[in-house]
């Protein structure tokens, strides 16, 4: 990739005029073929790999030539041959064509995103989802409104081609892309439907289409939002006197004009903050009521006219932070009013000011998560633990490992919430369900299982709190841990239980609009 970039410095038009010959490079398909055999980059089951023994690069080139012919367009996504062996061979070649197309288009896209996006006002993307929460903790308390938008994942093929045509002028390379997209759209399974482009589609081709489309939207929207702000994203947490000044300005005494030498101005600095995870993008706005109304009116129009994002009403939600809370990333996001006492001593006088500051307070949805555990047969609908019968065929270590993994991931993900008391209720459900599962497997009772296994039963499982419960940490440290946030930087995606609850919340909003 670096070699491509060095060559691009010498000739800036290489990525626009010389993409099509790369389709016929056998090395690209050899890379995909090796990954396909290893099962590392293909979504097909491993039992289908055995039919790829007679792989021919010449056949792949012929298929590419057939894509160029509109009258003899091949069906890439639907195979009508009843022979399963022939169908698997066809599927392997079609997947190779798509993989080659993806690899070729990824070369200029990767270089463009790497060397241009990071240079736009130091805007960078993070790998850990928990990198979003410190940002929210710093920016949300100083915002008035938020606009929560779910990016549409049904896009017309021609819109995708237009986004590529903005930075690729190589018409022969765009022609196969257009043919593939329309071939997929006109298949019997997707007739009269748009292209499904979303991170939930687990193929490299559609993941690339999704990343490219989102990048095109954000590369224009994010710099525009930054230019619309008068100030950079700064924290006002270290300026309590400014808050005190804004509070007292409401009760200021108006002097006569002849006695006042200067005018007092109370300026509110507008700021707009943006973050996205998956298909959800949130814009937090701080400013006057007029600015908020303008943003709520112009942003949907801007998306529709420039990006062709025709969002349904239920996919766009706007509300005031101080009065409502929103559900995102598996949390209830809200702003909690926190009293702050400031004492100022000047000579022999002591001034005390009572301030009210906003604090970012994400809430863990305990009751919905318990409902999800009941759906997975860890407990009943009232939260009473039951045995996981489907795991009784596993070994004791596997059972302990699975329960431990569920609790550890859940505790890691929700460790940034202040109110973690509800998490220990979930811990109780999982620990007792683990004991009942082992007792059901050995056809005994929980007391007998604990007596036979002794302290080794829960030595490995549910040990995340050792950093708080171990002797080196005092009770004060344990109490302090309840008031501190711990955002882990090794969480690449949303917790499965939190993600399931978030989908249920989105479905409820969609049903409200349908009614």
Curated annotation (Swiss-Prot):
Record carries keyword tRNA processing: yes
UniProt KW keywords: Chloroplast, mRNA processing, Plastid, RNA-binding, tRNA processing
A GO biological process held by the record: mRNA processing
One GO cellular component term: chloroplast
Major site of localization recorded for this protein: plastid
Cross-referenced Pfam families: Intron_maturas2, MatK_N
Subcellular location: Plastid, Chloroplast
An annotated Gene Ontology molecular function: RNA binding
Domain of life (superkingdom): Eukaryota
Function: Usually encoded in the trnK tRNA gene intron. Probably assists in splicing its own and other chloroplast group II introns.
Family per record: Belongs to the intron maturase 2 family. MatK subfamily.
Name of the protein: Maturase K
Gene assigned in the entry: matK
């Amino acid at each position: 990739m670096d070699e491509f970039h060095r060559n691009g410095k010498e000739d800036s038009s290489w990525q626009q005029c010389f993409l099509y010959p790369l389709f016929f490079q056998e090395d690209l398909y050899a890379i995909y073929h090796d990954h396909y055999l290893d099962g590392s980059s293909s979504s097909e089951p491993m039992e289908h790999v055995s039919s790829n023994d007679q792989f021919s690069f010449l056949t792949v080139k012929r298929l590419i030539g057939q894509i160029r012919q509109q009258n003899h367009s091949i069906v890439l996504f639907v195979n009508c041959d009843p022979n399963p062996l022939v169908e698997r061979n066809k599927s392997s070649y079609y997947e190779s064509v798509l993989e080659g197309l993806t690899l070729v288009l990824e070369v200029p896209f990767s270089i463009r995103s790497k060397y241009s996006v990071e240079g736009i006002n130091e805007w960078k993307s993070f790998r850990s989802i928990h990198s979003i929460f410190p940002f929210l903790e710093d920016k949300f308390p100083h915002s008035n409104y938020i606009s929560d938008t779910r990016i549409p994942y049904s896009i017309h093929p021609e819109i995708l081609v237009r986004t590529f045509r903005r930075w690729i002028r190589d018409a022969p390379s765009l022609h196969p892309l257009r043919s593939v997209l329309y071939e997929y759209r006109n298949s019997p399974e997707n007739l009269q439907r748009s292209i499904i482009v979303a991170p939930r589609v687990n193929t490299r081709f559609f993941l690339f289409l999704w990343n490219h489309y989102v990048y095109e939207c954000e590369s224009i929207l994010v710099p525009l939002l930054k230019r619309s702000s008068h100030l950079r994203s700064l924290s006002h947490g270290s300026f309590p006197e400014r808050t005190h000044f804004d509070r007292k300005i409401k009760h200021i005494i108006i002097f006569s004009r002849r006695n006042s030498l200067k005018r007092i101005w109370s300026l509110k600095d507008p700021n707009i903050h943006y973050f996205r995870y998956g298909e959800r993008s949130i814009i937090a706005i701080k400013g006057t009521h007029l600015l908020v109304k303008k943003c709520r009116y112009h942003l949907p129009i801007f998306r529709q006219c420039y990006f062709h994002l025709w969002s349904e009403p239920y996919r766009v939600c706007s509300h005031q932070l101080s009065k409502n809370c929103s559900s995102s990333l598996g949390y209830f996001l809200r702003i909690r009013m926190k009293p702050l006492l400031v004492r100022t001593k000047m000579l022999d006088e002591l001034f005390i000011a009572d301030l009210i500051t906003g604090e970012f307070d994400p809430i863990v949805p305990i009751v919905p998560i318990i409902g999800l555990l009941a759906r997975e047969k860890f407990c009943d609908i009232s939260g009473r633990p039951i045995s996981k019968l489907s795991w009784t065929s596993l070994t004791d270590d596997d059972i302990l490992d699975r329960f431990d993994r569920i609790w550890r991931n859940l505790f890691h993900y929700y460790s940034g919430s202040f109110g973690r008391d509800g998490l220990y209720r979930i811990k109780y459900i999982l620990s007792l369900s683990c004991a009942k599962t082992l007792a059901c497997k050995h056809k005994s009772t929980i007391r007998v299982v604990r007596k036979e296994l002794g302290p080794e039963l829960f030595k490995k499982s549910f040990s995340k709190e050792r950093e708080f419960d171990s002797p080196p940490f005092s009770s004060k440290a344990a109490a302090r841990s309840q008031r501190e946030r711990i955002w882990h930087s090794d969480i690449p995606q949303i917790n499965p239980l939190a993600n399931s609850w978030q989908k249920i919340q989105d479905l409820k909003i969609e049903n409200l609009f349908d009614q």
